[in-house]
Amino acid sequence: MGLVSLRNFFVLSLALNVSLILRAINQNEKLHSGALMAVEKGAKVAQMTFLSFPSLSSPSAAAPETQTPLGRERVVNLDHGDPTMYEQYWKPMGDKTTIVIPGWQSMSYFSDVTNLCWFMEPEFAKQIVRIHKVVGNAVTEGRHIVVGTGSSQLLLAALYALSPQDSSNPISVVSAAPYYSSYPLMTDCVKSGIHKWAGDAKIFDKDEPYIELVTSPNNPDGFVRHPMVNRTGGILVHDLAYYWPQYTPISTPADNDLSLFTVSKSTGHAGLRIGWALVKDVEVAKRMIKFIELNTIGVSKDSQLRAAKVLEVVSDSCEQAGGSEYTESFFHFSHTVMTERWRLLREAVKRSGLFSLPNFSPAHCNFFDNNLGTQPAFAWLKCDKDNVEDCESFLRGHKILTRGGKHFGVGSKYVRISMLDREQTYNLFIERLSQIRS
């Protein structure tokens, strides 16, 4: 009897354990199923959120966004100059700009100890000289090339290099309004004590040394700029980020003491964070290099190598355009896109009747060997509606985000609009602007 009872006890125990195990498995499956449903639901919500913002939208949407309720409600963000327009050119190029960097490469701080700019990759310097020769937009002979993490770091390096180190007062930094909105913030960011923002160059009247930032073509209005102050004791920094054939006629090679360039707006590779300066004075170049050394101990070699490859492909496309490998040059493609975008914008502005845009006189472009107009990377739009004083707020009410004139040192009737976003975003902007009526 005892043996039987013990056997029955084991059987009952085993049955209970099996029952508990099956219940646990069943609950786990329900939880897993619920989790999958939650993930799928979350993914759909995330996708909706993702598509709601133009700066993050997918360029490969199955249908035009303007045909969906989501597209109609979408906020068009053209406040910044993110050059995603250029994806149209680079995606079909395949592996032409692909590079492979082995794990052992680019490990040292030093790139070329024989070069004044010791952290600059020789191949990048070579391609900079080549692209300027191909385009004809800058003199490189007799210049020292300084590489920086975008032209923003190079501007700060230039201000550091050009400011008197032993003066009791900071040197004034000016630029003609409308000026690039980041100039005041960058100049006064660290309150260095050696330079300070002094505003509009057109009204600067102090009898003292100054640094004038000359942006040409200008950001935001697109006009070719020349120095405004023209007094003794002045030092010039030329920001030529937009002096490329897709934006403006290349009339002559820039021959300045200090010029700044960047791959961001020349080729569209803003994410590389690579720019360069062409500097005539060796001592100024040395001080700029010292600033970058103290600031970031040089510049990413990987970015330089990739930028060198991109510039090489651009130059190849210009020299071999019309062949089997390059049907058209990068700048021909970019110029065509910009021409069409400005045509659409001017038509939309005309239909609306509430806005106006600058007019640019044609000029001979040596690169294209033709008389061409200017088609800037940004549109400088003015709201002519009488009862609208703040154009930025007015357009925001129509789900169009721009940057208002107050950031550029002028009135709030003006806004800056990026012309460089993806095609879907730009077309939605044109459609929406055309529908605004008085």
Language model segments and positions:
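PLP-dependent class I/II
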Residues: 2-438
